[in-house]
Design a protein with these regions (language model features):
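Short, Lys/Arg-enriched segments at the junction into DNA-binding effector domains
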Residues: 3, 114-178, 182
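Active-site residues of response regulator receiver
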Residues: 8, 52, 79
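Positively charged, aromatic-enriched patches within helix-turn-helix-type DNA-binding elements
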Residues: 150-220, 224-227
Length: 234
């Protein structure tokens, strides 16, 4: 059973999300501020976090940054329509997705299940590669063991979020091929690409920071201006 940590200072929202998720067979943990969220994540196995942006004390943006220092579990931000800048900031610091309030229960469940599929496919709870998957991908100093879901760069293991891993996997499997931002979004997020350029760019920037010696002058993930991104053969 997957465990979802719900964090929002509005107790009615937490209660509603608890009902939606419990009805789908998920276990839940409930927090009402950012600090309580961090404490629960530290002391309990958690598979996904639903995290409100606007909270007193430690808000969702700062909580996301602190969570990303230790954990790779998917984080879905809960936002208001007026918080567009915060959505971008949240994605910049490591959130995987966001849901705009007021939300539809069906959308919440669909997004939670989508993120969990990615997480478990990358070796999260009950996860792991299938026996028929290509076990090892290499390019220059990058070694990607897709069976163990481990990435090393120049012999050092790097920690990637599920979305970063899947972007890298797509590019590593197709060295030299140019993918548009729309193609990357649709193949990795499994959703239609609607205004996804900034979302993809943010995740690729984070990925470069983890695998490139000089992210400003990347050796591996190259931009092809006006077309998209490719994995340079090294």
């Amino acid at each position: 059973m997957n465990t979802i940590l719900i964090c929002d200072d509005d107790k009615d929202i937490v209660s509603a999300l608890d009902i939606y998720l419990s009805s789908e067979g998920f276990a839940t943990l409930k927090a009402y501020d950012g600090l309580e969220c961090l404490r629960l994540a530290e002391s309990n196995p958690v598979d996904l976090i639903l995290l409100d942006i606007m909270m007193p004390g430690l808000d969702g943006i700062r909580a996301t940054a602190k969570l990303r220092e230790k954990y790779n579990v998917p984080i879905i931000l809960l936002t208001a329509k007026s918080e567009d800048a915060d959505k971008v900031l949240g994605l910049n610091i490591g959130a995987d997705d966001y849901i705009t309030k007021p939300f539809n229960p069906i959308e919440v469940i669909a997004r939670v299940k989508s993120q969990l599929r990615r997480y478990t496919s990358l070796g999260g709870k009950n996860g792991g590669g299938s026996a028929g998957d290509p076990a090892l991908l290499t390019n220059g100093g990058i070694v990607m063991d897709d069976g163990a879901k481990v990435v090393t760069v120049d012999g050092e293991q790097v920690s990637l979020t599920p979305l970063e891993y899947n972007i890298l996997l797509l590019l590593m499997k197709n060295p030299g091929r140019v993918f548009s931002t729309s193609q990357i979004y649709e193949l990795v997020w499994n959703d239609p690409s609607l205004g996804s350029e900034n979302t993809v760019a943010v995740h690729i920037r984070h990925l470069r920071e983890k695998i490139e010696i000089d992210p400003a002058n990347p050796r591996y993930i190259k931009v092809v201006w006006g077309l998209g991104y490719k994995m340079e053969k090294a």
